[in-house]
Amino acid sequence: MSERGLLIVFSGPSGVGKGTVRQEIFSTPDHKFEYSVSMTTRPQRPGEVDGVDYFFRTREEFEELIKTGQMLEYAEYVGNYYGTPLTYVNETLDKGIDVFLEIEVQGALQVKSKVPDGVFVFLTPPDLDELEDRLVGRGTDSQEVIAQRIERAKEEIALMREYDYAVVNDEVALAAERVKRIIETEHFRVERVIGRYDKMIKITKNPFKAK
């Protein structure tokens, strides 16, 4: 049986560059990842494929999954639910494939309560001035909204202590490389690999124990 895959939970403040860094990570073929497919109750749009773009479900089906604890994390936005189905993630991990989940901080904390052995990586800006410059550079938000995002970022950065690793996004390629090294290292943690040797070793007594 192959080693179970890792659940990599990747999050950070709005504007920190999560999507850009994730795309850089996925652009190289040196590691196989599965990007987690989200579930939603919003209507399926032309060209979208169930199980590829989203898992499309009715509101009743989604709420039943919430009730029975089958959602890793979820939120309601503009009248529709969005979230990460637990079954899909577990089935993929059981195949030995790493699952990469890019979500907001509150969602990441929901996931940690259900999958504590996941790898939780927090992407942080070099400083708040840099983060503000990036938000302004987007050209999509008013100054009021940007100020709100900065305040939210402060709150989220304070939650960094809940994560396993913090990666500074000072340069996209470097940040992506740091994340990949973290994942590679996690695959060699003793508690993750000892299971594969269970059939190879049978310890009946401690050879170093004094007689």
From Swiss-Prot:
Disulfide bonds: none annotated. It catalyses: GMP + ATP = GDP + ADP. Pfam families: Guanylate_kin. The keyword DNA-binding does not apply. Keywords: ATP-binding, Cytoplasm, Kinase, Nucleotide-binding, Transferase. Its EC number is 2.7.4.8. One of its GO terms (molecular function) is ATP binding. Essential for recycling GMP and indirectly, cGMP. This is Guanylate kinase. It comes from Streptococcus pyogenes serotype M3 (strain ATCC BAA-595 / MGAS315).
